[in-house]
Amino acid sequence: MHKPVDLTDTAAFETQLDRWRGRIGEAVAEAMAFGTTVPAPLQAGMSHAVLAGGKRYRGMLVLALGSDLGVPEEQLLSSAVAIETIHAASLVVDDLPCMDDARRRRSQPATHVAFGEATAILSSIALIARAMEVVARDRQLSPASRSSIVDTLSHAIGPQALCGGQYDDLYPPYYATEQDLIHRYQRKTSALFVAAFRCPALLAEVDPETLLRIARAGQRLGVAFQIFDDLLDLTGDAHAIGKDVGQDHGTVTLATLLGPARAAERAADELAAVQKELRETVGPGRALDLIRRMAARIAGTGKKSAGRDDLRPHAG
């Protein structure tokens, strides 16, 4: 049985994170190696979007949770690559002038700034197609597993989830309530966290009730991280975060609706619920270790850039 990483042993935990991040990064790079079969500017736009660093949290969650559930890493890798690739594609669209009109992403020019809007849009579409292809062609998985993973990913990016949430973000109700915002976060941000939790659970063939609870944990983790993102947009430093801040100016978020302190409390409550669900369904393990470290790092970024304590998640 896996022994949880001692969070006080920073070097050991960083080594584990670096290994996962490196494995995912290598596999993503391999997926982007088309040679001369793809127009060079399009391939460059795709690579710019998906290979420019990033924390790889969603992909690492696939590997961590899959490890806890006893799924071999080789069977998890295509899901991790696909989710990271879809996430990058969604950011390309999110940054477009007709959306958030962001100029920087992952400490470099946004894809539409570097390559133009047309190439950025085509890069996003191509990344999504490539993500599905990576899973559909994974011979480490059974045909049934490939089908269930593709179904999960298709739903995650579709009109009932990520795309619907992005629409809600662009055209919110005039008087948005807290529940309106939570619903938006569940669709837009939670979608890929749910997928990151569902994919390894599906591969582990957990029972339907456990699958539901694991997916619910992913949904709540997505809500927590969107709240942290709102707080960083409100109080953060662009250099420390690696992307534009102030993009939510004039938009109602939980950070502006509730205030930073109450929003941070809500995020902490969501994280506590995530940890409870995982302890009861999966048990102590690498996924919980990773989630705690993710929350601590995001909170640390917020405190460093804002010089305040109200971004600290106090979930146990």
What are these regions, as identified by a protein language model?
Residues 1-32:
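N-terminal amphipathic/basic leader segments beginning at the initiator methionine
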Residues 3, 7-10, 137-139, 208, ...:
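Short linear motifs in intrinsically disordered/low-complexity regions
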Residues 1, 91, 273-276, 280, ...:
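Polar low-complexity intrinsically disordered regions
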Residues 290, 294-307, 311-312, 316:
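C-terminal domain/tail detector
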Residues 32, 36-281, 285-299:
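Mg2+-dependent prenyl diphosphate-binding active-site environment of isoprenoid biosynthetic enzymes
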